Amino acid sequence: YNAEKTHLLGAYTSQTNPDGKSFATEFVAGDDIILEYEPPVSDEKARIAINQIGYGYNHLHVTTDLRSTGPGTSGSCMVNINCEEGEEWQNEKNGVCMMVEKIGKVGYLCSGSLVNNTAKDMKPYILSAFHCTQDYDNGKIASETDLNQWVFYFHFEHTGCENTSPVAGHKTMTGCRRIVSIPIEGGSDGLLLLLNDKIPAEYNVYFNGWDRSETATSSGVNIHHPSGDYMKISTFGNHPIKTTTWLDNLSRTGAPNAHWNVIFDKTTNGHSITEGGSSGSPLFNENKQIVGTLTGGNSTCRLTSGNNLYGKFSYHWDKYSQADTGRMDIWLDPLNTGATTIPGLSQTGEEGSLINYKSPTNVTAQSISSNNVLIQWNAPVYTQLISSVSGSTQ
């Protein structure tokens, strides 16, 4: 806790860190922190070693209460997840997390998402981007000790649309192990992690569904944490999504046609794009299934028409390697069903819909007598076959 005792973390017990290995906490507000240890009844001496202290500044949001201290540090064009743009994505947002990472002596920020699997057993897999495990300066890969100290933030969001609206009470998980790594060079920049512990039921998270087909979606969103800011949503649909090959200024070339290129739309409350910290975040199709993970791009609030490249989930699936650590199919389809798509799953076991339901249009109401109103509408048009007709009722 901090010196003012206004920000408290814990208590941490053997249940929090059952293996007694490396562990980390989320950030504490303030310049002074106090670590309090309560020994067991026995005379056993404590074995505690503080390996490193990370000092966050400028871009890290740590407040001593549940209210934001001001606008976020991401670009001014960003749209908060609880604006109207996110109304139809309230389940999916509960699976998206901010990742605070330790790689050697350096800290990084990325985004990721819980993902469902065909066993529907709520195994806490996190889907993200491989480059999130690399030190940008020297390419060093996060070690097992590093991964045990990664912290995953869920529900890190404003409760309203404005940056001045209250902040939700976030939940964190600490530690993971690497399951699948697919690099940028010659690959699709995919990463599958498994959290060290099962997520408590009261966390109210969501295991997002996926679509491993090669079909380019006509519309969708990206939910992410740009610059480590509170959760944002970026929307696309006015510009066709295109297949492309990754090539960056470090001369790294991805596998041919292993990325989606997305240009985001201006919406009611802004023109969200992506930034550093958005890396690894999920790209959702119109049916609310993950089809990609962010590698990077050149879009900014000044260049909203810039490119945003996502490693294809279809490539992550089984196209990079036959090794268990280079493909996601054996982990996310453990029953070997051959499923192409799968819906999301809540912690209560409720599955998401594979249909993105739309509102009727041209709704009119006409009073035809003192006790009757004629309501008419046009039903929405779907790309999937469902029961839907135009009509009227009294």
Which residues are covered by each model-predicted region?
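Serine endopeptidase catalytic core focused on the charge-relay Asp
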Residues: 27-264, 276
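Pro/Thr/Ser/Gly-rich low-complexity, intrinsically disordered linker/stalk tracts
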Residues: 350-383
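Extracellular low-complexity, O-glycosylation-prone stalks/linkers
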Residues: 379-394
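Beta-sandwich interaction modules
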Residues: 6-32, 38-43
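Short, surface-exposed beta-strand/strand-loop-strand elements in extracellular ectodomains
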Residues: 1-5
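Catalytic nucleophile loop of clan PA
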Residues: 113-124, 271-294
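C-terminal subregion of chymotrypsin/trypsin-like serine protease catalytic domains
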Residues: 126, 141-146, 162-175, 180-183, ...
